[in-house]
Every structure is written in structure tokens, then in C-alpha cells.
Amino acid sequence: MGGLKRMYVIVYGIVQGVGYRRFIQIHAARLGIKGYAKNLPDGSVEILAEGYEEALYKLLDQIKRGPPLSKVEKVDVKFDDYTGEFASFDTY
């Protein structure tokens, strides 16, 4: 397994009002990932996630897929150094 990393993601498309953040929260918890998913005013969702690199890539697969009612059109991803600032994965 790779080392600990931070992943910052902005997801565009039909991702608000369709259970998207909860979907990501469930998958993050299963993968042992900490951080948050937050709705942004422009209709996109911001995700900040920390965990093992392999787990983050598995979460990224779910981020791109989304729940059944969502339609992910674009995903911007940036990796950075792990900070350890989160104790859980929350939604806002």
C-alpha cells in the first residue's frame, strides 16, 4: 500500500440533491478515509480526503461514478501531503 496522502477534488455535474455527499461519506468510511464533502454555491461538490494512496484511488473511482441519481460531468483532482487534521469523514 502507498503512503498517506491528501486528495482535493471538485466534482461538477448533477451532484447536489441526489445523495452524492452521503454516498461518498459511506465509501470513505469503508476505506478508512478521513476528511469531508461539501456542497459549493456553484452546484459542485468539494471533497478533501486523507488516507492511504491506494484507498484514495478507490474512493476516486466512486467519486467519478456517484450514486444512481447523480451525473458526474467533470472531476478536478489534486494530491498533496498528508496532514492528519481529520478525525472522521463529514458532510457539509
From Swiss-Prot:
A Pfam family the protein falls into: Acylphosphatase
Membrane found in the keyword field: no
Organism domain of life: Archaea
UniProt-listed Enzyme Commission number(s): 3.6.1.7
Molecular function per GO: acylphosphatase activity
Coiled coil: none
UniProt entry keywords in alphabetical sequence: Hydrolase
Entries under Gene3D superfamilies matching the protein: 3.30.70.100
Catalytic activity reported: an acyl phosphate + H2O = a carboxylate + phosphate + H(+)
Residues covered by the Acylphosphatase-like domain: 6-92
Family, as annotated: Belongs to the acylphosphatase family.
NCBIfam families noted in UniProt: PRK14440.1
Protein name in UniProt: Acylphosphatase
